[in-house]
Design a protein with these regions (language model features):
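Solvent-exposed beta-strand/loop surfaces of large extracellular or lumenal domains
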Residues: 471-489
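Short alpha-helical linear motifs
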Residues: 103-108, 271-274, 375-376
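Intrinsically disordered, low-complexity coil segments
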Residues: 106-109, 260-267, 446-451
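Hydrophobic core segments within long, regular secondary-structure runs in both alpha-
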Residues: 8, 12-23, 62, 76-94, ...
């Protein structure tokens, strides 16, 4: 695999530090079945009432892994382990807890705090469920306990498709296209697999031209943009044509009716959600409603950029001069992410400076883990915000677009690094250059205390392993190696090394 245009071929210390943190978090045992309890480090706190559920931490932790895998495509084992852990948790009862427990209308809807007024049409205040209350069981759908098979609950199955697509693109492993159990709660146990979910969503979307709903009864451009991205991954990797339902919905409904991008002027307000039962499109200022832009960017980049620009202009951030006021952790992270995706250098510079000054980037010297504190003074780093900020940290020009529009190429059969003693050792570089038939590898120690220890790793997928040479780039000397089946084992010390593997 030769390097894609605009792609960086290495990871910095922050990215590797966050990878160490997420690896520990994902591999710490816990139980997401009904009788169990997710570990306290999984975020079920951020941005109530819509996103304060554990599964959004799983989802938001996925994106940076996909972006990192395109930086080091010849080293995938750690990414695959993390993604498997995230996806398995998403099959548990706790991932669907809102849909499984919020039955009927919210009994507290007459007592909502005034903060929720932005989220509810004024004429329905006091007699309408707030966004985030799923209302499973209300008519005309009735009780539907399957979180994927239900007519609603798009925000569960749509973002899950993104996770499954990123797993396949990162690993090439078909394990999640074999049937697996979901929820696992007695009679409420449901069997699905990647393609079945994509087929089901495609069929549902064909029947609902306004868009599938999340909570009963709300249709969200934000969640539909995410679901469209999940279908786009399935098409890219499995050769289906499911994404056409998104394209039709975008052309016929979303672009003009929901997001008001049909004018030369940028929109000042957009539809947060549409309720087809009461026939209300709830409008909010565009700075609060530009959230679909991050998911639209790989699908409809022109529309996504106009939506983003409208929101940034409303916040006074589009063409920053000097210090800026941050719009909150999640919004700041997605803004930085898109600034890097589209090479908006002034915005990137201003946001980076403010984020580093205000959001407490922190490196734990003993573990090599990197996280952001966000001035929250909490025991565990806030998961959803950290996952999104990690993606922004790793993003580069066009990197998010490439994930959904350019396949993984031949990386799964190209020379690949395995058996790295992670997290003690990490790779900041692992790239196979097809034209030169050369594999570049860079090792990084967890911290100074481990430097000098012995370590080994393997380079696999080598035809005729005895015909390959491994060189330490710094010294120009041959590295110490031994032959294994279809590969070589490299024996070295833990430190910052550069190796070149060439025929």
């Amino acid at each position: 695999m030769t390097r894609a245009t605009g792609a960086s071929s290495s990871l910095d210390d922050r990215a590797l530090g966050w990878l160490r943190y997420l690896y520990r978090k994902a591999t710490t045992p816990d139980d997401w079945d009904r009788a169990g309890q997710p570990h306290a480090h999984w975020d079920a706190t951020s941005d109530p009432p819509m996103l304060c559920w554990h599964r959004f931490d799983l989802i938001d932790s996925t994106y940076a892994i996909g972006l990192m895998a395109d930086r080091t495509p010849a080293w995938r084992e750690v990414y695959g382990r993390i993604l498997d852990e995230l996806i398995f948790r998403h099959t548990g009862w706790w991932a669907a807890r809102d849909w499984l427990t919020q039955i009927g209308h919210d009994p507290e809807r007459a007592n909502y705090p005034d903060l929720y007024r932005l989220l509810i049409p004024a004429h329905l205040w006091g007699d309408y469920d707030v966004p985030g209350w799923t209302a499973n069981g209300v008519e005309p759908w009735g009780l539907q306990m399957d979180p994927i098979g239900a007519d609603g609950n798009l925000f569960f199955k749509g973002f899950f498709l993104v996770m499954l697509g990123l797993h396949l693109r990162t690993t090439g492993d078909e394990r999640w296209n074999d049937p697996f159990d979901l929820v696992r709660d007695g009679e409420n146990t449901f069997t699905w697999f990647h393609s079945a979910i994509a087929d089901h969503l495609h069929e549902q979307w064909q029947r609902t031209p306004d868009g599938c709903h999340c909570e009963n009864t709300k249709v969200w451009p934000y969640c539909l943009a995410g679901a469209g991205l999940g279908l786009q991954y399935h098409d890219l990797l499995r050769g289906t044509d499911h994404h056409q339902v998104f394209t039709r919905w975008w052309d016929d409904v979303c672009r003009d009716r929901y997001l008001h991008l049909d004018s030369d002027e940028l929109p000042q307000a957009v539809t947060l959600y549409y309720d087809p039962i009461v026939e209300v499109a709830h409008e909010v200022p565009v700075f609060a409603g530009m959230v679909p832009a991050i998911y639209l960017a790989p699908q409809e980049p022109e529309g996504a950029r106009r939506l983003f620009e409208a929101g940034m202009r409303q916040l006074g951030l589009w063409e920053p001069e000097g210090p800026v006021s941050l719009p909150g952790p999640r919004a700041s992270a997605t803004a930085l992410w898109l600034a890097r995706e589209w090479e908006l250098d002034a915005l990137d510079t201003a946001l980076t400076r403010a984020i580093d000054e205000q959001y407490e980037p922190s490196l734990d010297a003993s573990t090599g883990e990197f996280t952001w504190g966000f001035e929250l003074d909490e025991e565990h780093p806030r998961g959803q915000y950290n996952g999104t900020m990690a993606a922004a940290q790793i993003a580069s020009e066009g990197s998010w677009w490439r994930l959904a529009n350019v396949g993984p190429g031949s990386r799964f059969s190209d020379p690949t690094v395995e058996g790295v003693d992670f997290p003690t050792v990490a790779l900041d570089q692992a790239w196979w250059d097809t034209d030169r038939e050369e594999l570049s590898i860079g090792t990084v120690p967890m911290n100074q205390s481990v430097v000098g220890r012995s370590t080994t790793f393997r380079v696999m997928n080598l035809d005729d392993p005895g015909g390959w040479t491994v060189t330490d780039v710094a010294t120009g000397e041959a590295a110490t190696t031994s032959l294994v089946d279809r590969g070589v084992e490299i024996r070295t010390t833990i430190d910052r090394h550069r190796f070149r593997v060439i025929r």
